[in-house]
Amino acid sequence: VILLLLTASAPSVDARPKTEDVPLSSFRDNTKSTLQRLLKRVNCCGIDESCCS
């Protein structure tokens, strides 16, 4: 009976805030590579139009 009361009063999985499963380091790596790609495109397009795709 006590176990049932404890189980019923415990917070459910739905009550917890949702978080991403992706580790922070992976997020940083993705952000860094995206920024590098954008910077390369900006610098390249000023010089050579063929790399702007």
Curated annotation (Swiss-Prot):
The cysteine framework is V (CC-CC). Belongs to the conotoxin T superfamily. Contains 2 disulfide bonds that can be either 'C1-C3, C2-C4' or 'C1-C4, C2-C3', since these disulfide connectivities have been observed for conotoxins with cysteine framework V (for examples, see AC P0DQQ7 and AC P81755). Keywords: Cleavage on pair of basic residues, Disulfide bond, Ion channel impairing toxin, Neurotoxin, Secreted, Signal, Toxin. Residues 1-15 form the signal peptide. The keyword Isomerase does not apply. It comes from Conus victoriae (Queen Victoria cone). GO terms for cellular component: extracellular region. Residues 16-41 form a propeptide. This is Conotoxin Vc5.3. Expressed by the venom duct.
